[in-house]
Amino acid sequence: EGHISLINRAKKENDIVVCSVFVNPIQFNNPADLEKYPRTPEKDIEKLEQAGCDAVFMPTAEEMYPNKVEDHYDFGDLERVMEGACRPGHFNGVAIVVRKLFEIVTPNRAYFGEKDFQQLAIIRHLVKVKKYPIEIVGCPIVREESGLALSSRNMLLSANEKEIATNIYKALKESVDFQQTKNVAEMKTFDEFYDAY
């Protein structure tokens, strides 16, 4: 549903919509993580057809990387914080595959979810550096009723882990609301609120 929201937005703003479905091996620094990453190609194609996607590009790793990958991008601090701090090389892998996809498809616009905000920033930087005439469109996060952001990886979470992830989002959201509506004198009560999570 999260990815389909990107297709829906793209359909409204473009004559032709092309979607890529590819689990990119070079953005995983942990082989076990790559191995367990959810893959449902038949379901993906069915959902994309239902959403009205005009073409699906589903290459193999051999087609995308027939030769040894030697490209390297340096995004500076942008790739060394948050997710990049614990996944070295991840954003270089993202940049390489996105560059290849852009050069194959040559889109006018490309749609990415704001859920992966750091990735979105990396891709915007890549487009600027490479001077691609592509508009990068960030699309809002789609959430489950519980508030948990939709993700293919959610199926890997136990019920308890899902509840914890949901509570993290609730705590962040409520802390922002609290900060925006309360004054400094009331901040002591925030500790009570925080301890509840």
Q: Which ranges hold each PLM region?
A:
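Nucleotidyltransferase catalytic core that binds NTPs
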Residues: 1-197
